[in-house]
Design a protein with these regions (language model features):
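Extracytoplasmic strand-loop-helix segments at the start of, or within, the mature domains
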Residues: 1-25
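His/Asp/Glu-enriched short active-site or ligand-binding loop at hydrolase and phosphoryl-transfer sites
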Residues: 21, 26, 88, 175-200
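Acidic/His-rich segments in extracytoplasmic proteins that coordinate ligands and/or metal ions
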Residues: 22-125, 206-246
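Basic- and aromatic-lined ligand-binding clefts that recognize polyanionic substrates
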Residues: 2-9, 131-188
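A local structural motif
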Residues: 30-39, 131-132, 187-197
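A short helix->loop->beta-strand "cap" motif at the edges of active sites that frequently abuts
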Residues: 15, 81-85, 251-253
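Structural recognition of the beta-strand scaffold that forms the well-ordered cores
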Residues: 1, 18-20, 59-62, 86-89, ...
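Conserved small/polar residues in nucleotide/adenosyl-binding loops
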Residues: 262-263
Length: 263
């Protein structure tokens, strides 16, 4: 996935990456040139054959729904038969139940420690531990700075994060309380109005409207799998839908865009 590729780029390992897939957002700033030299096997799900065709020594995956017990790309056992080990991001397999398919259910809340573990694991695999610690320390400083900027929020504001919608006339995919967006909201002093443990539950606009979120955060992405992947489509929907358009957050212009990635 793109985010796993970014971690490898940050570790100075771009020359080790022979293929990448599952792209939702843009290339991480500063790594456009490095990424341009890496073959994109698919914007979404690559085939098993496309992955093994690159003859990798290691396959990294962000999500078990792609490479896992019932992975749409393949299973770890299939790769193991070819002598290819699989590394799965801790963010998708620690404290999380993916047995029901889809995006899974988090038993414990996401924390940045999962990302730090991923960085350190990959740094150890490629013997660049010092660089791994530099990346971890930089991310910690950036998070501390972000928290300091909004320390006054103190849970007074609430929010809903709208990722996308498979169709505009059905319930949207929104961020559950235990995933990465839920963690970000909590870190920034925002109350997530969605209380589901699912990673990306579908929740109706009528239900969302009843919670009256102070802010709507709309995901902006390059992917075009669903109509609402397009931020312009999201904006038009919020402005014209009979329910969404009368929500105070929409009427008062408290709709904000954020670039979506895949953790």
């Amino acid at each position: 996935g793109a985010t796993m590729s970014f971690v490898l780029y940050l570790l100075g390992l771009a020359d080790k990456v022979v293929g990448t897939a599952l792209w939702i957002g843009p290339v991480l700033a500063g790594y456009e040139q490095a990424n341009s030299r890496v073959e994109r096997l698919a914007d979404n799900d690559p085939s098993f054959e496309a992955v093994v065709g690159k003859r990798p020594d290691l396959v990294t995956t962000q999500f078990q729904w792609q490479i896992g017990p019932e992975g749409v790309v393949g299973t770890p056992a299939q790769f193991a038969e070819l002598g290819i080990p699989v590394y799965t991001s801790p963010a998708d397999c620690v404290g999380k139940d993916n047995s029901g398919g889809g995006d899974g259910v988090r038993k414990t809340g996401f924390t940045m420690d999962l990302i730090y573990q991923e960085i350190r694991d990959l740094a150890q695999i490629f013997n660049v531990q010092d660089r791994g610690e530099e990346v971890v320390n930089d991310l910690k400083k950036r998070e501390d700075a972000a928290r300091a900027k909004i320390a006054s929020a103190n849970g007074k504001l609430s929010a809903v994060f709208w990722f996308s919608s498979a169709e505009l006339d059905i319930d949207p995919y929104v961020a559950g309380r235990n995933g990465a967006p839920g963690y970000i909201m909590s870190a920034l002093g925002l109350k997530n109005v969605i209380e589901s443990d699912e990673e990306w539950p579908t929740v109706g606009w009528e239900t969302i409207a009843k919670t009256n979120p102070s802010v709507i955060v709309a995901g902006k992405m390059d992917r075009r799998r669903f109509p609402a992947d397009d931020i312009a489509v999201k904006q038009k929907f919020l402005a014209t839908d009979p329910v969404a358009s009368i929500m105070p957050a929409v009427k008062e212009g408290h709709v904000f865009e954020t670039v979506s990635y895949t953790h």
